[in-house]
Structures are given as C-alpha cells and as structure tokens.
Amino acid sequence: MKKLITDLNLNDKKVLIRLDLNVPLKGKKITSLKRIEESIPTIKYVQERGGKIILLSHLGRVKTKEDKEKKSLSIVVEALASLLNSPVKFVDQTRGKKLESAIEKLKPGDVLLIENTRFEDLNNNAESNNDPELGKYWASLGDVFINDAFGTAHRAHASNVGIASNIKESALGILVQKEVNALWKLMEQQEKPFVAILGGSKVSDKINVLEKIIDKVDRLIIGGAMAYTFLKAQGIGIGDSIYEQDKIEFATEFLKKYNHKIILPIDHALAKKFKNAKPIFNNENPLEIPQTFIGMDVGPKTIELIHKYIKGDTKLGISPAKTIFWNGPMGVTEFEEFQSGSLAVVEAISQLVGAYSVVGGGDSIAIIEKLNAQMLFSHISTGGGASLEFIESKVLPGIDAIQNYEQTYEQYDSQVQSQDFSQNFDSPLVEETFSQSTSENFSDFASSTQEHFATSENQNTLINNYENPGFDSQDMFKTEEQNDSTSSFLTSTNPFSSEFSNEFKTSDFQDLKQTQETETQETLIPHTFEYTTDDLRHTLEQYVRETSFQTRESTFPTEEASFETLEETSFQTLEESFPTQSFEQVEQTSEKNMEVSTENFENASSQTNSFTVSDIPKTTSTFEDLETPETQNTTLEEVALETSNFEAQNLETPNLQTSNFETSNLETSNFETSNFETSTFESFNTGNFSTPSSTFEDLDLQSATFQTNDESERSTQENFEPTEVIESDLLAMKTTELEQEITNNTSRDILSEDEVAAPHKKRFWFFGRKR
C-alpha cells in the first residue's frame, strides 16, 4: 500500500507538493478554477500541521520563449490565495539562489509557489524527460514530497517521479486518493445498468479503454469524431468527416463482437466547412452524411436515443442507468452550434437520482461547467488522460514511484536504484509487493480482498457532509492512526479508500463530502432521537424560544388587550410554527406518556423522561394549577422525578382557547400569583433545581387559566390584564401522599414492576425539514 499524506510527520518540515494547476485560460483570464479548488484540501492539511509548503506545477506546454511569457504561474497566485484564505508567495524561478533563499525564510504554515516547471523544457525537455539532475535538485529543496497531481500521474516527469525517487519520504495527497477511489468504484463496484459514453476525435486514443470497459458495461454510446470510424467500418457514408483508416479493421472486429452493446449515431448535425458554420440535417437519409459535408455533432434522433439509454424508457423495457462513465464530447464543442449532443448527455445524467456518475476530459467538463451542473455528478476527474490509463490498468508512474507504506527507506532506495517500478495500477495500491500486481491476477486478488471495499451503510448520505455530491468520503482511505503526530482523519472501506474524520470535517473544506441524491421537493418528516434529561431541558428551552413572539409589542399591543385578542394572536403564531400541519395533528402525536412506578423513585433519577411534542409548553394552552393550603419543603427535582410526566388533557377546541394541562398527581403543588407585568414569566426555583428560565413572551402564555384540582374550587380567570409580575414557587407534596395518590389514580396506566425495573430511555419526537 502506498504511503498517504496522513502517514507523514509534517511539523516544521519543508514539504514539496506537486499540484495540477494547469487551469484553462482565455487570454489572461482563468476560465475554470476546478483544479485550483481541488488542490486546496491537501495544502490546508499540511498548513494545519505546521508544514512549510513549496508548491510545484506546470501550466500548458512550453516550447518557445514566447510560450514562456504566456504561461507563467503568476496568473494563478491571486485565485490560489483567495481560495486558500492565506497569503501565497511566488518566485519566478524554477531553480537558483533566489528560490533557495525564499524557501529558507519560510515559517510553518507559509505557502510558496515556484514558477512553471515546464519552463525547464526549454533546456532539453528536462522536466518532461525526467532529467535526473533536475529531479535531484528539486528533491533537495524539501524534506517530504507529496504528489497530489492526478492529471500528470500518467507521465514520468522530473517534478513527480524525479522528486519521489530522490527524497527520503513521499506520499500521495488527498486529491489523488479521491481520484483513485472514484475510478476504483467505477470499475469494480459499479451498479447495473452501467452505461459508458465515449467521444472525442480519435479511436486510437481510446482503443485500450474500449477493450477494457466493454465487458463491464451494459451499453456503450460512441459519439464525436471517433464514431465516424465505426460508421465507415459498417459501410455507411460519412462524407468528408474525419476518421482513422488504419483503425477500420479494429472497428469492424469490435462491432462484430459487441454489436449488441454499442450505440452509434443514427443522424448528424452537418456543415459544409469547419468554421463559422450552421448545423444542417439530412432529413431524407439521416444516417448517411453526403459527400462534401462534415459531421460536426450528433443529430436530434441520436440525442433522443441517448436520453433513453441513460434515463430509461419503460415502453422499451430500458432501465435508468445506475452507473455512468463519460469521457469526450459528442461533437465539436468549440462552436456553440455543435454542443447539442454534449449538452444532452449532461442533461440526461443530471436528471438521474441515486446513480453514480464519473466524468473525465477537459471538453466534457467544460460543458458541465457551462451549465453549472458540477454538483449533479458524483465525480468529475481532474485528469482525463490519467483516468483513461487507470481504467486501462496501466501503471501510473507518478503514483507508482511513491513509497509503499511497509517499505523502509533503505528498501525503497534500493528499488529506486534498480528503477523497479513494476507495480500494475490495476490493483490500486493494495498489494504488499510489486510482484503481486498484474492485470492477469487482478480479478482473483480483488475478490480475495472483498472485505476491504464493502460499501458503507451510510454511503449515500454526500458527498452526504463536500456534503461534491460528487465525492463520497464514506469510502476513502484507511482507518488506523498511523502516526502519533497526525490524527487519523481517514478510514478504510476498500483497499484504497477512506473517510475524513471529525477533525477534517470541521475544516474549511467540508464540501469534500457531497450528497449524491437530489431532492425534487422538501418534505416534512419526523425524526426520533434519544435524549438525557439535560438534553430535554435544553430542547424544551430552544423550542419555547422558537415558538415565542418576535416582539413584546406584537404580543401585548396595549395593557387593555382582551383575553380573546391574546388567544387569537397566539394561535396565529402557532400556525407559523407548524406551517405544514394543523395543531390538531401535532396533538395526536401525544398519546400516553410512560410513568415511573412509585416503587422505584430512587432509581428513576437515573432514567430519562418521556416527552412528545404535546408535552412541550404549547403557545396558547392554559394551565391547571393545583393549590393546597399547606406546602412542604420537598424540592421540585424530587417532585419531577416522582411524578415523571404531565398529561395533556381537555384539548377541546382547535384554537386552544380552553386547553388545560392536568397534573392530577401534583395535587399539593401551588402556584402563587403575584405581580404580573407584560414581559416576564420567571422560572420556578426551589431547592437545588430550576427549570429553564425564559421570558413570558418565550413561553407564549398569552392565555392562562389557573385551576385547582378540586372541581368545586375551580374558577376560570378570563380577560385578565397582563399588568403584574408572577413569581411562582412550586412546592411538592410528601412522598407518602404522592404514592397514595398515584396508587388511587385509576384513570392512568401504571407500569408493572418488571417494566419499572428495566432501564428505559424514552424518545422525543420533533419535525424537521429534509434537505
């Protein structure tokens, strides 16, 4: 297994990080920030662990001095610093004293970007040819090397393989791990139906991919210029369209063997010339392209066919795709007139729910970004060529050169000297030795390690918390804490997959985990959680705050406000609190509350109480207060533990004008009415216990009826004016009296001795919006 970034001690180390900052440019303007954004997590990770960061990257191809003037990495500094929320230093050298001096001045957490590594290609292609001296020089600038440039992982350059071969410690960054995980899942854990869409200009670029992927897919849709080679092989006229004559034989044999899986264009958008053209359609014979015409894009009938095989068609018995891989455009997307086929692919995939979709290739990604549909795809690869070579089971030199986790440096150094990088990437970084990894034994090896890549139960909850629906961190990386200096923020669910820990989830990059499911509408759903007594108090207090009036003035506009006016106002507030259901429905969720037996009052203190929505103080409910001429010194906490619950009764009308809460087992409790003012309802405080303190507004007790337990003594106070302050002390009855009361109370269900003896947690229900 390859070393990961979490295996390294980064504190106060000079950390060389190879990134892929090869952003698309239009003049001097960056047209897509995706590659910069994807680099941020690794930089942040090193920053937070005290590393001194030296960044290397290329930008485009540099063949002449004119290219050098246009391809300076200084263009990305501002965007990088903005996304990183940290200053970024820049040195316009790839080697020299100026660069070395800047590195020596770095402090932990500092970030330094050096100039475009491909400027060295002006010196006998030193970078692209992996010049040994250049690799050694760059390696000498740091203590640790991290390769996080998946886009160049299929190339052996001085800035990846050269550095990794000459430095003591090397590891893979977060982006590379994410990429490998996504492609591994695509090829080895795909759900059927599996639809692959391949476009682009050349069959020769994708022959190996075609041969590798065809056995795994249910349908293979071929578009772009490469489709014309297959049409030509079938004897269909393609006019002056581009095709590869030397691949006709391959296309013929491929179609003969897999014709039942392959979907080719059945009509075309044509043009007489390549530039400044408008689409023309051959309505008489849509399949044929007349002479002197060029195929520029797929036609409307092909678009309809693409939609059917991606989204499904019940009439034709075609199921919606569950796994999709797309690489390469359907037409000449440089011109807006010929983007329809590619846009149709984006539209179809984005409408799927619960499917796993992977996209690679710059042109395909550009179309997705044009529609701002990135979040509707499971994974958008930063490496088009690298992703194809990964699927082809080829060795990716930039990753293969990284140290194995099990290797000592001496073993690794010996391997470097012999240049024995023979690990086949078809078995993604999971073999203990290089000899185990060959494409021939890959299937057997993968099956033998099935337990490592079992799907997590919560896998579909986003990428549930970069909550990139594209990236599901549930199946990334490995679990064990591998270094005392770094907390293990990665856990394993397959040979090369892991999950970000709480530490990383709370960083600035929670967007690394994203929700794949797209909800078409919000629904009100119940959730249930277990709470302790303290949690319930907090929840009740929060609930009361949320259902309170916004201002005192709206609650009590005047001191002369009538009791009926207050009730009407509070009911409107209640409707706002439950916008999608009536209060009667909420009341129905309150059936019966479990009680604590009188025989187990001492043990009851360790048990949590049962509450439902109806137990929370309702905004317009009136209370029955049981008064007694004599009070005892029992604390409220003891009474609460003995009586366990209040039972909501007598909810007679929808507007709750006569609602009462009976507390029949608190017959000696006493509310003493004193001063009532317009704003304060003070908390009950007795002994060592106090209920959550809140304002009169918060409790929404706009209507209050205090009644005694004795029916003959009950009297309703109507039209009271809220002009005095109430200070209420709830005093309890003696334990013996309470036990007798509960024993004699036949209107309530008493728990059996067995039920009381068994510890139990009760549940508190609330309603929340599903996002």
Swiss-Prot record:
Main localization of the protein described in the UniProt heading: cytoplasm
Keywords: ATP-binding, Cytoplasm, Glycolysis, Kinase, Nucleotide-binding, Transferase
A cellular component term, taken from the record's GO annotations: cytosol
Pathway assignment: Carbohydrate degradation; glycolysis; pyruvate from D-glyceraldehyde 3-phosphate: step 2/5
Compartments, as annotated in UniProt: Cytoplasm
Binding-site residues for ATP, renumbered to this chain: K206, G295, E334, G361, G362, D363, S364
EC number from the UniProt entry: 2.7.2.3
Highest taxon of source: Bacteria
Molecular function per GO: ADP binding; ATP binding; phosphoglycerate kinase activity
Annotated catalysed reactions: (2R)-3-phosphoglycerate + ATP = (2R)-3-phospho-glyceroyl phosphate + ADP
Enzyme type, top EC level: transferase
Assembly description: Monomer.
UniProt protein name: Phosphoglycerate kinase
GN (gene name): pgk
